[in-house]
């Protein structure tokens, strides 16, 4: 493909909001059961559209749990074709690796690829499953070298394992009388400064959003009949960009990736870092 778009460092593409885990405080409301799987043909068409507008160094295929998508191999292959020079990353919790036995071969074939595995359970039985799955899918195949803490490399594939149950987790929203609410610190600069996902614009249903948390606000509020909630009103006014948006509008968006936005007020200004609470595991036998 030709006619590259504006250069950015990172771009996430959310191919599904379905997940086999429910992690308390998930940055994109996934723990509240939002089932959606984008059609493969739409993903390819949308990526091709956005390539003409954005030229990322790093593209992350994410969910939900992206391995739930039946065409995940093809999605990774197409992502490489379209974003030809970018690192192509897939972000997973590793529970479904046995159902995707060719994932390592696909990643080696596309090259310049990365797997990010995030562990969300302290339960030894679940941790054993994750470790076994990682060994069978990756570590047992090829020669891996430790390149940094929790990161190994084999040929042109990088595997990084993180564990938020050990710390560094915080609640992107708060619960008031059993209802999910935005934070009310009203300090978007501080919220942006302390945010863990502040430089990761994301494509969701073919719209480009500043960050993962804002991308799912309307989806969550619609499902829970909260569109009239006054506390969420400022954030419902935010709209993602379409791939045919005005060039100046997109340039403004790109510049703002590294700056706070008024929508940053929905997240805490001074988040309290903590170990992530145990994720609810769905449909996994132990």
Specify the residue positions occupied by each region the protein language model found.
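Disulfide-bonded cysteines in secreted/extracellular proteins and peptides
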Residues: 19, 23-26, 195, 211-213, ...
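Short, intrinsically disordered, charge-biased short linear motifs at domain edges
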Residues: 6-14, 178-184, 244-257
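Conserved alpha-helical substructure of the radical SAM core
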Residues: 1-92, 97-102
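N-terminal pre-core extensions flanking Radical SAM catalytic domains
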Residues: 1-34, 236-244, 260, 270-286
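Soluble or luminal CAZymes and related metallo-dependent hydrolases
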Residues: 38-43, 71, 126-129, 187, ...
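C-terminal accessory region of radical SAM enzymes
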Residues: 150-171, 213-274
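Conserved AdoMet/S-adenosylmethionine-binding subsite of the radical SAM
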Residues: 69-205, 209-210, 214
């Amino acid at each position: 493909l030709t006619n590259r778009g504006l250069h950015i460092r990172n771009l996430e593409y959310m191919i599904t909001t379905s997940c086999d885990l429910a992690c308390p405080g998930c940055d994109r409301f996934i723990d509240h059961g939002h089932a959606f799987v984008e059609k493969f043909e739409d993903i390819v068409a949308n990526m091709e559209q956005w390539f003409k507008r954005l030229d990322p160094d790093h593209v992350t295929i994410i969910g939900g749990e992206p391995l739930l998508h039946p065409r995940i191999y093809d999605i990774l292959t197409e992502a490489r074709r379209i974003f030809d020079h970018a690192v192509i990353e897939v972000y997973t919790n590793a529970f479904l690796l046995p159902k995707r036995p060719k994932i390592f071969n696909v990643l080696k074939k596309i090259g310049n690829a990365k797997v990010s595995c995030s562990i969300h359970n302290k339960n030894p039985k679940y941790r054993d499953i994750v470790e076994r799955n990682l060994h069978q899918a990756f570590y047992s195949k090829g020669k891996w070298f430790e390149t940094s803490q929790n990161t190994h490399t084999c040929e042109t594939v990088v595997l990084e394992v993180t564990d938020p149950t050990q710390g560094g987790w915080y609640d992107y929203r708060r619960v008031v009388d059993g209802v999910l609410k935005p934070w009310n610190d009203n300090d978007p600069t501080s919220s942006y400064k302390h945010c863990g996902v502040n430089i990761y614009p994301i494509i969701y249903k073919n719209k480009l959003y500043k960050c993962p948390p804002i991308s799912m606000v309307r989806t969550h509020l619609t499902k829970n009949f909260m569109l009239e909630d006054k506390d969420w009103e400022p954030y419902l006014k935010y709209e993602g960009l379409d791939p045919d948006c005005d060039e100046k509008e997109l340039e403004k968006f790109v510049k703002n990736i590294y700056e706070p936005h008024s929508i940053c007020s929905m997240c805490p200004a001074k988040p309290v870092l903590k170990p992530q609470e145990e994720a609810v595991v769905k449909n996994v036998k132990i």
